[in-house]
Amino acid sequence: MVNEARGNDSLNPCLEGSASSSSESSKDSSRCSTPGLDPERHERLRDKMRRRMESGDKWFSLEFFPPRTAEGAVNLISRFDRMAAGGPLFIDVTWHPAGDPGSDKETSSMMIASTAVNYCGLETILHMTCCCQRLEEITGHLHKAKQLGLKNIMALRGDPIGDQWEEEEGGFNYAVDLVKHIRSEFGDYFDLCVAGYPKGHPEAGSFEADLKHLKEKVSAGADFIITQLFFEADTFFRFVKACTDMGITCPIVPGIFPIQGYHSLRQLVKQSKLEVPQEIKDVIEPIKDNDAAIRNYGIELAVSLCHELLASGLVPGLHFYTLNREMATTEVLKRLGMWTEDPRRPLPWALSAHPKRREEDVRPIFWASRPKSYIYRTQEWDEFPNGRWGNSSSPAFGELKDYYLFYLKSKSPRELLLKMWGEELTSEESVFEVFVLYLSGEPNRNGHKVTCLPWNDEPLAAETSLLKEELLRVNRQGILTINSQPNINGKPSSDPVVGWGPSGGYVFQKAYLEFFTSRETAEALLQVLKKYELRVNYHLVNVKGENITNAPELQPNAVTWGIFPGREIIQPTVVDPISFMFWKDEAFALWIEQWGKLYEEESPSRTIIQYIHDNYFLVNLVDNDFPLDNCLWQVVEDALELLNRPTQNEREMEAP
């Protein structure tokens, strides 16, 4: 791809097919020594715990289990994203031997934990059991976990298949064997957690014997302990004292189970072989068929237990057994004052917790609303841009062949998407209306609100409210916006709408607008843009690869940056012309993959979406004069006015 000569307002391609998806080499990133904006990104889990304990800052963590279905996997990842907002220190994912836990299936323990780390940015512990497995299998699972970016393992024996425990020849028989093997094979790479049983393991000969086994696990290399659930604070206090007397000094985190239903309580008690206190039974039995009443009681009980634990000074944090539900646990945490939705962001985009991405601090703006897709397409990179985007000539983005990978799939089912986007489209204007309703928040003619688009699976970003009226006006006229940001000139980094990074800094943005529009509008835009050559950078491309840009030598353009005390300037978001050509493949494909395929082939609705896909252009505009008023709206308005201006023949026909 080369620059189109300035002043040429035709849509002849500069170079067709100039960028194609490839993953043959890693991104040539120009690394620098820019200090990390978020210290926790660079810390091991055990170090995060230690720092929190030294400061007295209590934490919470959450346990989940793998779902049984692909749809359940999509829902669980959505739940991860929602519950991440409260600020858990980590989550853990259980190991289900019956569910092929180490496989690449979307319902496997390995894939769910990997997704939490890579695509949800969550510090994650993967449970791993050693019963009924050969040494080679266990070692293979651990190597795979390391490759996927998992750095924390909860080492467990696991439950036997059937009622009787049988030793595995050539395998491990106890959790301590697994701990020793991990330390022997992987050194200090993994942080290791082990289980503690406040009333003793049901298969142990005695409470004292079980404590001895726990001490062996810690001595073998375990970093911290998470306990089985319990119902009374004194049970935990006695356990901690016994551990201390035994010489166990690592953190001991209590496991909390908010009772959420009669049947789930019975099932969990059966599995854990715990006895429910009589006073709890007396309350639950009369209301066992009233789930809401039991849940409310469970919340009250959990809050009371947690208050008692926290007041003791013996508890560094709380670990919640969620049963893959969010309401009860979230409510308990809110009542405890531990659920903290901090609007501050380390960077303007969603982070990944994969160790090799710890230094990453620059991304193209195009994937702002599809961060999981960006992470997927760059997963094979060996290094990630740090300090600046670097050499733009050789980014290698992997192909997005499968739009239905569970962590990239829309959170909304097909039936709901049809209700939002239209069970029947009658014209291009029907599509315009969907974009307008997404921005306005108004229900459509069938009473359904449009809460997502193929390019935006989340509600509108807070900063979009600063542009809402202008966006509504242009979308009504066929400027179908999928990404935008206002110009910002030195707002505090603590600003709740546009702020990011450490406190005490200032953030800046160039105005940015990205949209689909018709060829006719694109041609009018090019004529108008002649007047803005030195101020506005533009790039127009269609699905065939025809493109026109005035980007100087195809260099990346920093559109977001921040200045912070004692640090170099951070520029986390760029408009990169080369990356835009990779993004356009994905952006155009979403018309068909997520919208068009909702309709039958050859149907009028499918034909309309196909026409837009085949004929519209994807455009991005950058206003480089960020201290001045945003000129992009005037550019678009002038283009629309030019487009709607009567031709010479029309004027002659209208003349008297």
Swiss-Prot record:
The EC number(s) this enzyme carries: 1.5.1.53
Phosphothreonine found at: T34, T94, T451
Description of activity control: Allosterically regulated by S-adenosylmethionine (SAM).
Residues that hold substrate according to the record: D159, Q228, Y321, R325
Pathway(s) where this gene product acts: One-carbon metabolism; tetrahydrofolate interconversion
Keywords: Allosteric enzyme, FAD, Flavoprotein, NADP, Oxidoreductase, Phosphoprotein
Residues bearing the modification Phosphoserine: S10, S18, S20, S21, S23, S25, S26, S29, S30, S103, S394
Binding residues for FAD: 94-95, 127, 157-159, 174-175, 197, 201-204, 210, 217
Keyword Transmembrane: no
Gene3D superfamilies from the UniProt entry: 3.20.20.220
Keyword Oxidoreductase: yes
Gene Ontology annotations for the cellular component aspect, listed alphabetically: cytosol
UniProt xrefs under InterPro entries: FAD-linked_oxidoreductase-like (IPR029041), Fadh2_euk (IPR004621), Mehydrof_redctse-like (IPR003171), MTHFR_C (IPR053806)
Binding site for S-adenosyl-L-methionine: N456, A461, A462, E463, T464, T481, I482, N483, S484, Q485, T560, T573
MF (Gene Ontology): FAD binding; methylenetetrahydrofolate reductase (NAD(P)H) activity; methylenetetrahydrofolate reductase (NADPH) activity
Complexes and interactors: Homodimer.
Domain free text: Contains a serine-rich phosphorylation region at the N-terminal and an eukaryote-only S-adenosylmethionine (SAM)-binding domain at the C-terminal. Through asymmetric homodimerization, the two regions are positioned next to each other and N-terminal phosphorylation increases sensitivity to SAM binding and inhibition.
Record's function text: Catalyzes the conversion of 5,10-methylenetetrahydrofolate to 5-methyltetrahydrofolate, a cosubstrate for homocysteine remethylation to methionine. Represents a key regulatory connection between the folate and methionine cycles.
Protein name, UniProt field: Methylenetetrahydrofolate reductase (NADPH)
Gene name of the encoded protein: MTHFR
